[in-house]
């Protein structure tokens, strides 16, 4: 009889562990998505799916794509498309990198709110971030050595901005690399000569203002019309078509309820 009870207890324990694992969703990757948007999506999803838990690590798009390749997350957040080398690395491990566009974004160039400059051209942005121009007086400002803040190299925004705004040139040698959008906004907000870039969801941070680029401001309308030059899609990556809880969360994100949150946070809905 004791053996039967022991066997039953073990079976219930295993079932409980399996159930707990089934209700846990591991999401890794992009800070742009993972610092604000995905946690808010997760909270609403949990309200509709009691018992669900999330493990969200927002450490850069590269880490999210790597997590899908390594099998350490069900969803990888990315503000950029997976590189050919990453797709190949996934295939070598029997993984199929499946992208789902979940929101659109505009990369905003921000300066300190005390900076008198009213706007920049695409050429001036390239010159500033590559180090060709090092003083605000060269781009219509009142003078002062420009302090450039960028994301770190694991960030999708780091590589996207390099491609969209800098013709794939290298960043200025003295640029300071930050871990996330909020850190860039904080540093620029404290430095009258600072300049950096953030996703649209972060432009309302205190002490900063977003620059019109060739007259176009980053907004839902300009991103949808592609008139703002630094627009981009953002992604969830999964190993093939998502299933189970991952599928439910992806479907929620791209559905009406999720896209309402996308807009509220400051991103641009996909529809």
Please provide the spans of the model-predicted regions:
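Bacterial N-terminal signal peptides that target proteins for export
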Residues: 1-7
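Bacterial N-terminal signal peptides
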Residues: 7-16
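Exported/periplasmic ABC-transporter solute-binding proteins
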Residues: 21-271
């Amino acid at each position: 009889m004791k053996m039967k009870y022991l066997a039953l207890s073990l079976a219930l324990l295993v079932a409980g562990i399996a159930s707990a694992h089934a209700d846990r969703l591991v999401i890794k990757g992009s800070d742009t998505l993972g610092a604000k948007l995905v946690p808010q999506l997760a909270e609403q999803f949990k309200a509709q799916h009691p018992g669900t838990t999330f493990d969200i690590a927002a450490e850069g798009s590269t880490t999210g794509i790597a997590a899908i390749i390594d099998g350490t997350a069900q969803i990888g957040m990315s503000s950029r498309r997976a590189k050919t080398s990453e797709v190949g690395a996934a295939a070598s491990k029997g993984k199929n990198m499946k992208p789902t566009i979940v929101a659109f974004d505009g990369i905003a160039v921000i300066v300190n709110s005390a900076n008198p400059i009213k706007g920049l051209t695409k050429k001036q942005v390239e010159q500033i971030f590559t180090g060709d121009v090092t003083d605000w007086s060269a781009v219509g400002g009142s003078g002062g050595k420009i302090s450039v803040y960028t994301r770190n190299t694991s960030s999708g925004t780091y590589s996207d901005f390099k491609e969209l705004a800098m013709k794939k040139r290298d960043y200025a040698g003295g640029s300071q690399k930050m871990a996330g959008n909020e850190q860039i906004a904080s540093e620029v907000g404290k430095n009258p000569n600072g300049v950096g870039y953030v996703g649209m969801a972060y432009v309302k941070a205190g002490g900063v203002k977003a620059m019109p680029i060739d007259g176009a401001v980053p907004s839902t309308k300009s991103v949808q019309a592609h008139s703002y030059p630094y627009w981009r899609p953002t992604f969830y990556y999964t190993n093939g078509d998502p299933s189970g809880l991952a599928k439910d969360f992806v479907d929620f994100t791209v559905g009406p309820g999720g896209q309402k949150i996308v807009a509220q946070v400051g991103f641009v809905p996909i529809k």
